[in-house]
Amino acid sequence: WANCAVNVAGSMGERGDGAYKDNFTKETWKKTVKSIETIIDEAAPKHTYYTIEPMPWMYPISPDEYLHLIEDVGRDRFAVHMDIFNWITTPYRYFFNEEFMEEVFEKLGRYIKSCHIKDVLLEQDFTMMYREVKCGGGIINLEKYAELAARYNPDMPMIIEHLHSEKEYLESIEYVKRRLKL
């Protein structure tokens, strides 16, 4: 059986994972909680967790907000799929990403069932833009990320995503293996 099923909270606009102002209303929070409760209650999983992947423009957008979501949902089969890279949306979180990782794992580590592993690069331009890049193309300390995840699960699933070619995936896998001495 699967360790977890990963989804996003969803958006209040045309695109299911899109960025919209209405993603951040109290009504959207209530709909998100109700949706998660309904999915878990109807599926009644015994061995698998239902998880929400954090996104930069929909609930939850911080570790504290994710804890609040866990509390509001109140289901033991609700957990976390961690994509910390989607939360690196400010200069502080970017430049102090190791401290941010520590905060995230301290607060959510016991709930995390799987992780995305990738890298982030701040474009050197006057309009701030973060670009998701292959592992090794940004500034993230991947060893620290893997070490923090392993504290909670030595066999934590780590998933690479959003690359443009098989070659990029293979390069990222080799880079991660070298960095993590696998």
Could you tell me what each predicted segment is?
Residues 1-80:
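Active-site acidic/histidine proton-transfer and metal-coordination neighborhood
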Residues 37, 63-182:
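Histidine-acidic metal/acid-base catalytic patches
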